Structure formats: structure tokens, C-alpha cells
């Protein structure tokens, strides 16, 4: 069942069966990516493809994030593979729920709200037992690449194992204090540039600076001449995981046609290493970065996306400041624009 939400000229759709947001349009822009096989019958009927991959689109909430080697859930957990229950949906706001029986009947309530250029989400986690990883999973596609900007990070790291063996640009199992990752060929790659000219499947984790009160990622798309700003509460989501998917997956249903895709996966996890590893002492927890969320109490996870036209000449953000209902975006040149943003969302 598809639920439509509207505010002004903004339109979003929540797919209750897949748990994702396959449509978000605003001002003629479509910021989010939809997999090309999403409606192909042969993929939808394939029992070997996880539901989250069959209907891959937009943004969805992962709990647990990635591999669940504790409870045996499919990749990204029941929140991304099982139907949601609608609690209320009217106008610009929808509220939905999902229950996780294998985690002590933990309840996840999802709130989606459209306000102007923003798509706001809150996930309220209640009850349950044990520890769990989680992350948002918005995806954007770039026809001709783009430029990324980030809030201050104190580390960048890659997993010990590749997403798709032999197809990673970045060297494995590294930890750096800047945004320049070592590559397999001995060179370096600036994480602010999407590797559009490379057929790769890559993944890295960025760790938020300790004093950040607002975490953000900005994608400026070249061909599309727009920008997507993704905002998070860094206390709840201390890492941003970047998934680069650019034609390297040559097996069904991907078949080398998943190109130009960037996942901006803000959350609490140990990269792509699975729930069991995240629940143990690890290299992130050694940096005082939490990699799991303890169930059994109420947690509120706040996230937002803002879609804007790209101002002429802009190539990179140097700062994003939220104050009194206004987002101030500063470009590397010092130029600024002010964007209305709903007060109270990150309170």
C-alpha cells in the first residue's frame, strides 16, 4: 500500500510493504534514487533476493543495519523487509509502526513530515531487549557525478572486507584522520568527489567530531544542478557511512546497471561488519563512539533531508548553521543562503 503525503508543491510516497520512501519531489526536483528493477516481475518473484533489494528505493530505516548475525533477520532487518502498520496519515504527515519480535517486541514508530523543501523523519524506539545497530539509508543518483561536503569528522575508515570482492577502489581496513582514503593502487582519493569514472562497489565510515551539535552531508549533483542536504542528530547517530554503487555488482538483480548511486547512511553501527561485531569492543568503541543502541528504553532518532537548487558557482559547503528556524548554508567562497527550517525538529 502506498501512502501519499503533500505540502505545497512537495510530494512524498511511503511504501508500507517495503518500508521505504520511493518518491519525493519538490520544485521539480527528484532527489532520491529508485533501483531500475523495482517493478520487474522476475525480480519481485525471485526468492533469493531480499525484500529490501527487490524494492530498493529512496530512504528507509535499517534495524539492525547491514548483516544481522545475531537474530538471523535479512539484511537491514525487519524495518526494511516487513510491512509497516499505518497509525495515521493525513495531509503532510504520516505515522507508522513496526514491531521486532526477535528483539523482545521492540516497537519502532516512524513519523514522516513534509515542510517546504524539507522531508523530516523521527523514529521512536520503545521496549525490546538487547543491543541493536541502526541507520537511515537515503540514496541519491548522479548522472555525471557530484561533489560532497560534510560536517567536521575526526576519522574515516574502511571495513576489513570488501562489499564486492575485487571491486573496491579504496584500500581495506584503514583508519585516517582526514577525508583522503588510500586506494588499492597506491594513490589517494578525496572523499568529497564521487568516483564517477570508476566501476566500483565501495564503503567507508566517517566519524563525527566530538563537539558537533548538528551533523550534515551535502551532495551537489553536477548534471542535475541541485543539492541535497542530509541532517542528523550526531549524539544519536555518530557515524555517517557512505555506500558507493557504480556498476560493479554484475549479478542479479544488479546486472551492472546500478550506477552513480550514493548511500548516505547515518546511524550507529560498525560499518558493514554486522551486529555481533558491533556489540563487542571494537575500533569505534575504543574511540568512545557507540556502535549499538540498548533496547528497553525510549529513544528518539531525528533526521532530515533538504532539497535545493544549486546556486550558480557553488561547489562545496563549508558550514551549515541551524538557528531559530533558519538553516544558513555557507559556500567555500563565503557566499551564504538562508533556508527556512521547522523549529523544534532537532530539539
Where are these regions (language model features)?
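Surface-exposed acidic/polar loop and edge beta-strand patches at domain peripheries
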Residues: 1-120, 131-347
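Asparagine-centered strand-capping/turn motif at beta-strand->loop junctions
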Residues: 124-128
Amino acid at each position: 500500500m502506498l501512502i501519499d503525503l503533500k505540502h505545497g508543491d512537495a510530494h512524498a510516497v511511503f511504501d508500507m510493504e517495503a518500508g521505504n520512501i520511493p518518491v519525493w519531489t519538490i520544485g521539480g526536483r527528484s532527489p532520491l534514487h529508485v533501483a531500475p528493477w523495482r517493478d520487474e516481475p522476475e525480480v519481485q518473484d525471485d526468492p533469493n533476493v531480499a525484500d529490501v533489494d527487490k524494492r530498493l528505493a529512496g530512504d528507509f530505516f535499517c534495524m539492525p543495519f547491514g548483516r544481522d548475525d545475531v537474530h538471523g533477520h535479512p539484511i537491514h532487518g525487519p524495518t526494511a523487509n516487513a510491512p509497516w502498520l499505518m497509525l495515521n496519515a493525513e495531509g503532510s504527515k504520516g505515522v507508522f509502526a513496526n514491531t521486532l519480535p526477535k528483539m523482545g517486541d521492540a516497537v519502532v514508530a516512524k513519523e514522516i513530515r513534509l515542510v517546504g523543501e524539507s522531508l523530516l523523519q523521527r523514529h521512536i524506539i520503545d521496549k525490546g531487549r538487547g543491543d541493536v545497530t541502526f541507520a537511515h539509508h537515503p540514496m541519491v543518483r548522479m548522472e555525471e557525478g557530484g561533489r560532497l561536503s560534510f560536517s567536521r569528522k575526526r576519522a574515516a575508515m574502511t571495513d576489513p572486507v570488501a562489499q564486492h570482492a575485487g571491486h573496491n577502489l579504496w584500500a581495506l581496513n584503514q583508519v585516517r584522520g582526514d577525508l583522503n582514503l588510500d586506494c588499492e593502487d597506491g594513490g589517494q582519493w578525496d572523499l568529497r568527489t564521487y568516483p564517477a569514472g570508476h566501476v566500483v562497489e565501495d564503503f567507508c565510515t566517517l566519524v563525527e567530531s566530538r563537539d558537533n551539535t548538528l551533523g550534515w552531508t551535502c551532495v551537489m549533483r553536477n548534471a542535475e544542478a541541485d543539492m541535497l542536504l542530509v541532517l542528523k542528530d550526531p549524539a544519536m547517530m555518530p557515524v555517517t557511512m557512505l555506500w558507493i554503487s557504480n556498476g560493479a555488482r554484475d549479478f542479479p538483480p544488479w546486472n551492472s546497471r546500478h550506477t552513480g548511486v550514493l548511500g548516505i547512511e547515518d546511524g550507529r553501527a560498525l560499518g558493514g561488519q554486522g551486529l555481533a561485531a558491533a556489540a563487542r569492543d571494537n575500533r569505534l568503541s575504543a574511540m568512545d563512539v557507540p556502535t549499538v543502541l540498548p533496547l528497553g528504553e525510549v529513544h528518539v532518532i531525528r533526521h532530515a533531508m533538504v532539497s535545493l537548487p544549486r546556486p550558480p558557482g557553488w561547489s562545496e559547503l563549508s558550514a551549515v548553521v541551524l538557528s531559530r528556524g533558519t538553516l544558513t548554508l555557507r559556500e567555500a567562497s563565503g557566499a551564504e543562503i538562508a533556508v527556512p527550517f521547522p523549529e523544534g525538529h532537532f530539539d
